[in-house]
C-alpha cells in the first residue's frame, strides 16, 4: 500500500515539474523565442529544434546553466529549480 502511495506522489511531483518547466520555457527562460518544441507551440528556428535533437536532461542542464553557442548562460537568471524544471520538461516534451 505504501508503495502505491509513493508511486502516486512521484507521478504528481513529475507532473508538477513538467508543468513548471513548461512555464519556464514559455516565460522566464524565454526558450520559446529561439527553440522549436511542438508541445510548447513554438516554431522558432534560431536555436536547435528540440523535437529533432531530443536533448536529455543532463545535456539541457549544461546548456541552460552555462550557455552554448549564441545561447546565453541562464545560471543566476533562472533559479536552480527553474533550470531543473525546464530541463525535465524539454527532455520529456521532445520525446512526445
Where do the protein language model's features map onto the residues?
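C-type cytochrome heme c attachment motif
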Residues: 26-36, 69-72, 84-88
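Inter-heme linker and motif-flanking segments adjacent to c-type heme-binding CXXCH motifs
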Residues: 16, 41, 92-96
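Gly/Gly-Pro-rich "capping" loops immediately C-terminal to redox-active cysteine motifs
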Residues: 22-23, 32-68
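Electrostatic cytochrome c docking/interface patches
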Residues: 8-26, 59
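Bacterial N-terminal signal peptides
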Residues: 1-8
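C-terminal capping alpha-helices of c-type cytochrome domains
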Residues: 76-96
